[in-house]
A protein has these predicted regions:
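Active-site and adjacent substrate-binding regions of carbohydrate-active enzymes
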Residues: 1-318
Length: 318
């Protein structure tokens, strides 16, 4: 496994091709580097879904015949994906969007990577003061851009650090709702090096393990499906409608089997892309639903209406 900033999708195919004896997988970064103004990390932009789809399409197409893809949206250098591309403003939208983003990623062809806390829907830390941060990249960037070069206002820079700073992914893992989230004993003499996310009393592993509707339970199902279903593990990947602003849709095919994956990455009800709607025009039943972010009965109704609810996604046999 290699970390490969600057490596193209085409080069990834060569490096990960077993015949070349180099590496099994690479982390490519174009899909987590594009959503900022003028290539400045501290000037984040809203998600451009068509652009994200095109980047993933390049990565998927490059390894269609040889090589392999690494699937990730989070790591120790990236903000929490549910805060970045989802909606963590309410508990309901956090859970729904975390599931939608997980479904979108895990249904691609490749090996998914789950960064600690992603399976719980952990959010950005939402610090409001510079002295709460510990990452030198953020602290140095503030000094250089605000105090020395004066190319960015303090308010804009703090917003940029809050949205893209690496400390978002580096707060203690939220194991439970105790004082330090179970990372260390609640009565420990020494506090963790950085503050625990304040929402750890609501978002933690202990609270999600036995909840059938939790993000954690959904991720367990996503991982199980990849082991159970050869179509998900190895099927060919084909994008549907790169230009749709809200729905990320694609198919997986293997032999005579086909799976439609359609995920609404917005907080509104939207129409299915035409080509996706045509695949379900004769209707689907609950047994056809492999997995969905709502329940299967809701997915059946949504697909019959050729639409998806807020943050609704489904993988369905067609």
């Amino acid at each position: 496994m290699g970390e490969a900033p600057g490596i193209t999708a085409q080069r990834n195919e060569h490096i990960t091709n077993p015949a070349n004896g180099e590496l099994d997988m690479l982390f490519l970064f174009e899909h987590v580097d594009f959503d900022c103004e003028d290539n400045v990390k501290w000037k984040p932009l809203p998600l451009d879904l068509p652009q994200l789809k095109r980047i993933f399409a390049k990565q998927q197409s490059a390894v269609k015949n040889a090589g392999w893809a690494s699937l990730f949206t989070g790591n120790h250098d990236q903000p929490r994906v549910v805060s970045r591309w989802g909606d963590d403003s309410t508990e309901g939208s956090r859970v729904r969007s975390a599931k939608a983003l997980g479904l979108m990623l895990h249904m691609h062809r490749g090996t998914p990577y789950v960064y600690q806390g992603e399976e719980l829907g952990m959010t950005d830390v939402h610090f409001t003061r510079l002295d709460q941060y510990r990452d030198l990249e953020s602290l140095n960037a503030y000094r250089q851009r605000v105090e020395e070069a004066k190319v960015q206002s303090a308010e804009s820079m703090m917003a940029g650090i809050a949205a893209r700073g690496r400390d978002n992914a580096r707060t203690p893992m939220q194991w439970d709702g105790s004082a330090y989230a179970g990372f260390t004993a609640p009565d420990a003499a020494v506090e963790p090096w950085i503050s625990v996310n304040r929402n750890h009393t609501q978002i933690n592993a202990a609270g999600e393990f036995d909840d059938p509707d939790s993000v954690y339970t959904f991720y367990k199902r996503l991982i199980a499906i990849r082991h159970e279903n050869a179509l998900v593990a190895a099927g060919d990947w084909q994008l549907i409608d790169a230009d749709d602003q809200y729905v990320y849709a694609f198919t997986r095919t293997l032999g005579g089997e086909k799976l439609l994956v359609a995920v609404n990455l917005s907080g509104r009800t939207v129409d299915l892309p035409r080509d996706a709607a045509e695949l379900v025009q004769h209707g689907v039943t609950e047994p056809d639903i492999v997995i969905s972010t709502y329940d299967a009965s809701h997915a059946v109704v949504s697909l019959a209406n050729r639409e998806l609810g807020p943050w609704e996604g489904a993988a369905v046999r067609v």
